[in-house]
Amino acid sequence: MEFLKFLLLYKSTKKTKEKGAYIMNSFLDNFFKLKENDTNVKTEFIAGITTFMTMAYILIVNPSILSAAGMDSGAVFTATALSSIIATLIMGLYAKLPFAQAPGMGLNAFFAYTVVLSMGYSYQFALTAVLLEGLIFILLTIFNVREAIVDSIPTNIKKAISVGIGLLIALLGLEGAGIVVHPKDGGTIVALGNITSGAGLLAIIGIVITGILVARKVKGALFLGMLITAVIGIPMGVVDLPNKIVSMPPSISSTFMQFEWHNIFSLDMVIVLFTLLFMDMFDTIGTLVGVATKANMLDKDGKVPNIKKALFADAIATTVGACLGTSTVSTFVESASGVAEGGRTGLTAVSTAFMFFLALFLSPIFGIITPAVTASALVIVGLFMIETIKEINLEDYTEAIPAFLTIIMMPFSYSISDGIVFGVVSYILLKLFAGKSKEISMTTIVVAAVFVLKFVFIK
């Protein structure tokens, strides 16, 4: 009798769980339009974890860089995680796009090494500049200025951006693992690092394993590749197991709302602000356009869906990040890894945000995600990103040359924004002197003029 009661209770509980799962899946499907985007909850979740794993390094690197500016590294760690959570949630729930956000590399270096250490200002001054940048971006987004800039980029260059980002991502992966290094003797720009032992060897093993998984069309190949690589790295001595699992996040009291207002009308503030605006705007635009192009998310007019919401999410993210106490928050190029795993909606971003939340309390565990582990995913994603080169018009040299400059300048200058600058400016010059000036839009000319002014007077 008791056994029958148990069976009935088990059956009832199972039905309740199944019903609950069905309701949840239906809600997620309706909210994020999963079926419409040819994806599902499992795919989005794996994509979100993959994105997190390829960008988790920011939790370690950002505090290290900003501590050089006199900021408490523990507080910056918490601010980095919190700003990434909030920013990525906004991108996922509001813009409903699979892009993750966190304090941007390059932007944090400018914050610490240029504004604070070189120019001699306090980190409070730098945080004030970041706050003003975010507020200006909010206004520019409301009045459709940033959206107009995105639309002004020629179609061929948009496709080239995806290819250039692919090469840059691959370079980041190879460099992080020590496969590609900067030689101390200065004989060459880059050289081959140590690939017979340590991180370099582990990264190569990871690339081969991930490549096999991709070739065999294994679902979640990038995620599984990193997981297997991390396990192999333990006996190799490259990946260290943590001494503890749980740790409470440090306080952000020393960085929260730390602003300095008495220098906001100085010439230096104008220069710093313009540089931040320029770097963040075109890094973000390049990432959104490049990754969306690879994911076939562009509409028939070549526009990114919900681009205004995505740009607004980016602007809010920078503002929130400044209040918490970190440098400019931007859309991460590593979002391409999640897209490569099939992520197509905001549920991917929500999953990434959840992983950042876990990282707040489980930071020792996430310490095993070393550059040698993530290199495999970044290199393979680089391959995926360059596939759009097949769609670039190489017959018309006024289209092909700007596209080529966009592609090669991203990895060579280590900058997405600089690649876009070379592409757009050369596009206008070639069209103008080839007698094709009618193909140039006025907005594109204005954007190019801003590029030139920036490089003449600031860089």
How would you label these PLM feature ranges?
Residues 3-23:
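Short, Lys/Arg-enriched N-terminal segments with co-localized hydrophobic residues
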Residues 24-75, 190-192, 224-308, 449-453:
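Helix-loop-helix hairpins and the membrane-proximal interhelical loops
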Residues 25-62, 83, 104-113, 117-162, ...:
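Helix-loop-helix junctions within the multi-pass membrane cores of secondary transporters/permeases
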Residues 64-75, 115-125, 269-270, 370, ...:
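Helix-coil boundary and interhelical linker segments in multi-pass alpha-helical membrane proteins
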Residues 69-89:
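Loop-to-helix transition at the N-terminal end of transmembrane alpha-helices
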Residues 85-105, 136:
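Juxtamembrane transmembrane-helix boundary signature
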Residues 119-231, 235, 350-459:
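Membrane-embedded alpha-helical modules
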